[in-house]
Amino acid sequence: GTTVEIDVKRNGETMHFTVERSEISMPTVQSAMAGDDIGYIHIFSFGKHTADDFRDQLASLKIAGAKKLIIDVRMNPGGMIYAVTDVANQILTKGTVVSYHTKNGESESYDIEGIEDPLPMVVLIHKNSASASEILAGAVQDKQEGTIIGENSYGKGTVQAVFDAGEQKALKISIAEYRTPSGKTIDKVGIHPDIEVSQ
């Protein structure tokens, strides 16, 4: 990568450093066995590598004997739509995961091929589970393929677009809203858990 020159003044003395820039990869998925046959997967956000990391860790948990899943999206602010639909494709049956609807009546659904025999699962949510994490929880709940446990989620269900405003400025506006497979609105409502547990 490229380098940057940094001067640090400490105790009256100036020290000069040349630092090489590099990409920092932050893991978005962590997993562990939570019992003899229970796999636990924590998804911190839905980014570029999330679906592949989820696939690898889910496979490892199955090899370790996981026959049930706990998927934790607490404190998950969301992320990329393709990442959450790819994760859903690995754990849910065929069908719609989410749809979006514009004010002028246009809509599009995100469908998956899915799997034939999903593992029994619970999804943990709370007040800071937002956007893509709510899409996953909403799909699990609407398809009745797992139990949602925790607190009502954040309620961030809008689609944004960024427009170049010139002079190194941009305008980000909401252009549509997400809905669960059954058509429930997420925005300002959130996902209500099947079992409420305050955290």
Which ranges hold each PLM region?
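Short hydrophobic-aromatic micro-motifs
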Residues: 41, 171-173, 186
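Short, acidic, Ser/Thr-enriched surface-loop or helix-capping motifs
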Residues: 180
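Cleft-lining beta-strand/loop regions that shape enzyme active-site pockets
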Residues: 1-156, 160-166
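Short acidic, Pro/Gly- and aromatic-enriched capping/linker segments at domain boundaries
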Residues: 165-177
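Conserved helicase C-terminal RecA-like lobe
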Residues: 188-199
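Generic structural signal for well-ordered beta-strand positions
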Residues: 15, 186-187
